[in-house]
């Protein structure tokens, strides 16, 4: 039941409450200044009609006007009550008045100001809203202005009132100057580009400015250049030319874009000739190919657009294009620009490095057909290039300059150029030497032989002050007398044009200066030999040998010894031996083989056979390991030819001891084959037995097949058994090698035994050995399978004096100790039948005696 009551207080004659409100009313009467009591009461009355709820808020605020909680909830509730009403409804004005009343006490609360301003923005009352924002900024301390300004700026941007917004932004930038980019973007959007350019220029020049968008100073510069260059009619307060040129000095890595921006500014301003001047200045000053490409492409596009506009204008006026002189001029200008591109690009590269010799040569080639420009280019090049900073060979510029004059018939001018070149302080002696050689070649091409000799003799003359060839502190003019290039050319000219004595003097001088090469020494000796001065040529070889060490002296020794043997043969055998011993003393193993073979040939032809064998024996020790096998082959061949094959047994034995397993195996087979030919079956069998220790049956099946064939032909039951026993022993030896087993385990995949990685963690130490044992058992089983199967046919070895009856009886008996040969062995011995064995008498091979048989 609802009970309506009226309070007896005279100040509240209209206050009405229900029976459920009595407890809250009584509590309020006891604690009327308690915010919590009022809030509990208000929370209880949330479902009551809006006037009753508002009345309750008013009662509370009258007693507690400084309660932020009450005001915040009350204002929020009042705004919610009018949310779906028309903004012209009088209720909105009542809510606004409530906010104004609240600010009498709550003017320091930014949250209430923000809610009120947002409420006014929703009503669309622009002036009232702007003034309220201003009141909020005045009422709040400056530390809390940052909470008001974002909403204020959003309000300013939401209405097409640029002047109001500009004034607001200017005030905001005083508080937050780092937000200048936001203001600049607004100015651009509102088409106030002049002020935007001013603000952007200020930002760019402020070194302390940090972009909120993370833009670099160059990016801001680029925005400024684009802004002022693309809007010349709207940006009036800035000196665009000065700004962009200032950027050219600051941002040297982006010159192309800045130059294009400056030219674009003048193009949009209608100053086309000024824009063309900017382009020309740009392509003559940029330092990189990238910048040049940007500027040149923009320049060419500008000229094309000008020509297209001119042609369109002419067509509209009805004039013939052929009669338009201005159009012809523009076309000619555009063609000249395109034709100048390679030369302009070359200029860019030379501005990067004016000492780049190759680029100067390319520049000359670009002027092909224009002699005056070529001469000017060469002159500029030789004056610009510093030999100590040059990239390339600077002397080639002088030589090419002289060659240009020579090709055009101006021989005197060419001589003058080369003479000046000989006085240039080059960095390398070789440059000056090349110039002197070109001087000589110039005279030779025009058949001035005496002048050529005179020039080269002048170049090689001793200077007043001698200097070492590599002494960088001395000018190259004092060091060129030691240049081998000049001396070599002089020696060639003396051989062709001079006398024997003058040529000999030149070669002697080269040797005295110790600048000769092995080829120079050989040339000198050959020159003396051609003139029948044999001993002098040998002396030249000796002098050359004293100048060089191994391996450079190798060619000199080879030529010297060959010439000496060809000259004297066996007449000066002791001297030849001394020369060989001298050559071999200190000779590296790499070069010893040729000398030893030459030495042995000398002994074979003119000396003693035992001396030749001694030389071969020394050679097998002196050469490189890779050449020992070839050396032993030669040694064995020569020993067999001279002394007979029996003399090679010791050589074979030594070769087997020295050579690697692969080559030793081949030597053993050859050795055993030789013994077989000599009828020494036991010696051959011993060799096979020795060699078997280095022959793994799995990889050297050819050896075991050879031994098996040998035993089938020459052996008996016991020898074959011994061979098979040795084979099993060797195979077991190789099987038990841990390294081999490990490598085999890695190769086996998917086997039943598995791998170490398949084991459980913690068992690797014990199970590694288990796997090795399993693998060993597997390999042993394979070895058992590899053993020869029991033969179906029997090979019986019988005495040669057995009768046919005994042979037949033996053929029918089963031998309990018969040899188990494999199927392949059975096939090889199918032809052997237990018939009579015929013994043939063989003659001694002729190779046994060698060359001694002839004696």
Swiss-Prot record:
The modification Phosphoserine is found at residue 851. It is found in: Nucleus. It holds the Pfam family HAT_Syf1_CNRKL1_N. InterPro entries: HAT, HAT_Syf1-like_N, HAT_Syf1_central, HAT_Syf1_CNRKL1_C, Syf1-like, TPR-like_helical_dom_sf, TPR_rpt. The modification N6-acetyllysine is found at residue 420. Keywords: Acetylation, DNA damage, DNA repair, mRNA processing, mRNA splicing, Nucleus, Phosphoprotein, Repeat, Spliceosome, Transcription. GO terms for cellular component: catalytic step 2 spliceosome; intracellular membrane-bounded organelle; membrane; nucleoplasm; nucleus; post-mRNA release spliceosomal complex; Prp19 complex; U2-type catalytic step 2 spliceosome. The keyword Transcription applies. Disulfide bonds: none annotated. Residues 810-855 are annotated as: Disordered. HAT repeats lie at residues 15-47, 48-80, 90-122, 124-158, 160-192, 198-230, 235-268, 270-305, 369-407, 498-530, 532-566, 571-605, 643-677, 679-713. Its main location: nucleus. Residues 820-834 have a biased composition (Acidic residues). One of its GO terms (biological process) is generation of catalytic spliceosome for first transesterification step. It comes from the Eukaryota. Belongs to the crooked-neck family. Involved in pre-mRNA splicing as component of the spliceosome. Involved in transcription-coupled repair (TCR), transcription and pre-mRNA splicing. Associates with RNA polymerase II, the TCR-specific proteins CKN1/CSA and ERCC6/CSB, and XPA. Identified in the spliceosome C complex. Component of the XAB2 complex, a multimeric protein complex composed of XAB2, PRPF19, AQR, ZNF830, ISY1, and PPIE. Identified in a pentameric intron-binding (IB) complex composed of AQR, XAB2, ISY1, ZNF830 and PPIE that is incorporated into the spliceosome as a preassembled complex. The IB complex does not contain PRPF19. This is Pre-mRNA-splicing factor SYF1. It comes from Homo sapiens. The gene is XAB2.
């Amino acid at each position: 039941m609802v009970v309506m009551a009226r309070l007896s207080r005279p100040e509240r004659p209209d206050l009405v409450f229900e029976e459920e409100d009595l407890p809250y009313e009584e509590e309020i009467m006891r604690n009327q200044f308690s915010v919590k009591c009022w809030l509990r009461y208000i929370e209880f009355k949330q479902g009551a009609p809006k006037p009753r709820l508002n009345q309750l808020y008013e009662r509370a605020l009258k007693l507690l006007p400084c309660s932020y909680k009450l005001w915040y909830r009350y204002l929020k509730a009042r705004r919610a009550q009018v949310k779906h009403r028309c903004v012209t409804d009088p209720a909105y004005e009542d809510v606004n008045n409530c906010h104004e009343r609240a600010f009498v006490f709550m003017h320091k609360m930014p949250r209430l100001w923000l809610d009120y301003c947002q409420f006014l923005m929703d009503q669309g009352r622009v002036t009232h809203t702007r003034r309220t924002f201003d009141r909020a900024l005045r009422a709040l301390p400056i530390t809390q202005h940052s909470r008001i300004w974002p909403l204020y700026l959003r309000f300013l941007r939401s209405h097409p009132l640029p002047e109001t917004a500009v004034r607001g932004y200017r005030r905001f930038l005083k508080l937050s100057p780092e937000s200048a980019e936001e203001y600049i973007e607004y100015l651009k959007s509102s088409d106030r580009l002049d002020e935007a350019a001013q603000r952007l220029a200020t930002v760019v020049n402020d070194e302390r400015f940090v972009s909120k968008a993370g833009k670099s100073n160059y990016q801001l510069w680029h925005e400024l250049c684009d802004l002022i260059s693309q809007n010349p009619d709207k940006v009036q307060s800035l000196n665009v030319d000065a700004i962009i040129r200032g950027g050219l000095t600051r941002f040297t890595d982006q010159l192309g874009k800045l130059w294009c921006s400056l030219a674009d500014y003048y193009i949009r301003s209608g100053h086309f000739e000024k824009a063309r001047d900017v382009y020309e200045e740009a392509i003559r000053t940029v330092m990189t190919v990238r910048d040049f490409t940007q500027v040149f492409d923009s320049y060419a596009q500008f000229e094309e657009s000008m020509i297209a506009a001119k042609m369109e204008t002419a067509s509209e006026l009805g004039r013939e294009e052929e009669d338009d002189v201005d159009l012809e001029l523009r076309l000619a200008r555009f063609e000249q620009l395109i034709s100048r591109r390679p030369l302009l690009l070359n200029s860019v590269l030379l501005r990067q490095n004016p000492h780049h010799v190759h680029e100067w040569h390319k520049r000359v080639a670009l002027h092909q057909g224009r002699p005056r420009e070529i001469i000017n280019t060469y002159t500029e090049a030789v004056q610009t290039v510093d030999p100590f900073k040059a990239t390339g060979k600077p002397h080639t510029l002088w030589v090419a300059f002289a060659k240009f004059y020579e090709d055009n018939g101006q021989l005197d001018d060419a001589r003058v150029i080369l003479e000046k070149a000989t006085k240039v302080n080059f960095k390398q002696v070789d440059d000056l030497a090349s110039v002197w050689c070109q001087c000589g070649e110039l005279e030779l091409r025009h058949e001035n032989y005496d002048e050529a000799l005179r020039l080269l003799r002048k170049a090689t003359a001793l200077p007043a002050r001698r200097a070492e060839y590599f002494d960088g502190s001395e000018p190259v003019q004092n060091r060129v007398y030691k240049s081998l290039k000049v001396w070599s050319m002089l020696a060639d000219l003396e051989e062709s044009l001079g006398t024997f004595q003058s040529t000999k003097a030149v070669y002697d001088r080269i040797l005295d200066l110790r600048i000769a090469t092995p080829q120079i020494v050989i040339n000198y000796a050959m020159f003396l030999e051609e003139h029948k001065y044999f001993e002098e040529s040998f002396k030249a070889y000796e002098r050359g040998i004293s100048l060089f060490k191994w391996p450079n002296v190798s060619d000199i020794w080879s030529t010297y010894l060959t010439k000496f043997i060809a000259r004297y043969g066996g007449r000066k055998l002791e001297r030849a031996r001394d020369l060989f011993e001298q050559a071999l003393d200190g000779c590296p193993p790499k070069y010893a083989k040729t000398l030893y073979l030459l030495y042995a040939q000398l002994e074979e032809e003119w000396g003693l056979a035992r001396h030749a064998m001694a030389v071969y024996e020394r050679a097998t020790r002196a050469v490189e390991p890779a050449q020992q096998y070839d050396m032993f082959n030669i040694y064995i061949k020569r020993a067999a030819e001279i002394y007979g094959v029996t003399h090679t047994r010791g050589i074979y034995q030594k070769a087997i001891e020295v050579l690697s397993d692969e080559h030793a195996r081949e030597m053993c087979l050859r050795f055993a084959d030789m013994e077989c030919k000599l009828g020494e079956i036991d010696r051959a069998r011993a060799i096979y037995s020795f060699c078997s220790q280095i022959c793994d049956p799995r990889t050297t099946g050819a050896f075991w097949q050879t031994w098996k064939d040998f035993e089938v032909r020459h052996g008996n039951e016991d020898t074959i058994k011994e061979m098979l026993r040795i084979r099993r022993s060797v195979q077991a030896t190789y099987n038990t090698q841990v390294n081999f087993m490990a490598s085999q385990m890695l190769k086996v995949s998917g086997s039943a035994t598995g791998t170490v990685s398949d084991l459980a963690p913690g068992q690797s130490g014990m199970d590694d050995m288990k796997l090795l044992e399993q693998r060993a058992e597997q390999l042993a089983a394979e070895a058992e399978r590899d053993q020869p199967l029991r033969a179906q046919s029997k090979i019986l070895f019988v005495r040669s004096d057995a009768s046919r009856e005994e042979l037949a009886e033996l053929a029918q008996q089963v031998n309990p100790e018969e040899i188990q040969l494999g199927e392949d062995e059975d096939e090889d011995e199918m032809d052997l039948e237990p018939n009579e064995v015929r013994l043939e008498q063989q003659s001694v091979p002729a190779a046994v005696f060698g060359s001694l048989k002839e004696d």
